[in-house]
Amino acid sequence: MKTKSLFPLFITVLFFCTSSCKKDEKTDNIETEFKGDIIIVGAGASGLSAAKKLQENGISYQILEASDKLGGRIQKNIDFADFPIDLGAEWIHADKSILNYLINQQGNEPDVETILYQPTNVQSVSGDTITQIPEQDMIDYYSNYIIEYKFKNTTWYDFIYENFTENIEENIIYESKVTTIDYSGDKVILTTNNGLEYQADKVIVTVSVGVLKSNVITFIPSLSTEKINAIQDVEFLPGFKLLMKFSEQFYPDVISYETNSGEKSYYDVAYGKNSQDHVLGLLSVGSSAEEYYLLGDSNAILQNVLQELDGYYNGLASQSFLGNYIYMNWGQQTFTHGTWTSDIQASSNNLNESLNNKVYFAGETYNTYGVLPVNGSFILRGSVQSAILSGYKVVEEILF
């Protein structure tokens, strides 16, 4: 089935915020009798939010992170342009007040500066034809369907680092790829790729569902058929970002495409930023990404993209390209194996269920919140806030 990407979104999230973000049970400190040790696998958004909640409640924990840095699919670059660029998650996918909710801060106005993201200079591609979408159609679209924000002079990585790493980073053990999780005994024993063993009373697995689908972690006992099927039924598509710097802006705010699965969009990365640079991004996920992969390496993909843009804009892409580009291929990253959760066919009960109340799962895939009880935000799987809230929720499950 073909899908239409009106502008680059990691996932569409509707938001109906009419009140201030207040404290609620999802982020309040929890009284508990649990005094054991916990190991978190993965230092992405959900792993760090789980760690923050454990730390607030005085629970001993460690984080095993496979890579040499924290953040998971939330990363940034500060050298490519005159503003910081999100290499992974980029859009907030909700009203800006969700940022306060995530850190248990009252009020609708976050401390960080944001951009109301409503591009109106949008072109659409169908087959070989590119057409301009009427500005009023885009205005009506934003009025009727979606509120979207981005960070102005910062990134998702900055938000995560500033709010979820204080006194936590010292508990992260980097370059520790978990290969085996043995939950057959009283303690859960984890083995890493360097042969080290760690044990804990409980384990929270926050690796991407793409990693689980790839079977790079061995569970002892083996996962049930129901659990395996639930994981394999999650749609977790490959994809990449290609960021290119030009001497002039010859392109609109957004170029959207029809795709068989996932999405494909070009977008002005500098939209609303305090920038003198001209940076165009290509977000390609699903079927379009797989077609690009067939071309070969990043340079082959770049040349194909420039040729495509030249066809739309009379050769201006190649003429104004400065030679600088970033290719962030999340679909083939060793520790992610994909982009984000776009669809789930399986029962969320099988997907979210712990293993013998010893091994728990958290991340953007496992969100079960729906509409938040306080500010009316509708949180779908696949967003950063889904990952953060999942980390909070799994700690509640353990401590209660």
Listing of model-derived features with the role each one plays in the protein:
Residues 46-49, 135-142, 187, 264, ...:
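Conserved flavin/dinucleotide-binding core of flavoenzymes
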Residues 55-80:
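Glycine-rich FAD pyrophosphate-binding loop
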Residues 13-38:
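Bacterial Sec-dependent N-terminal signal peptides
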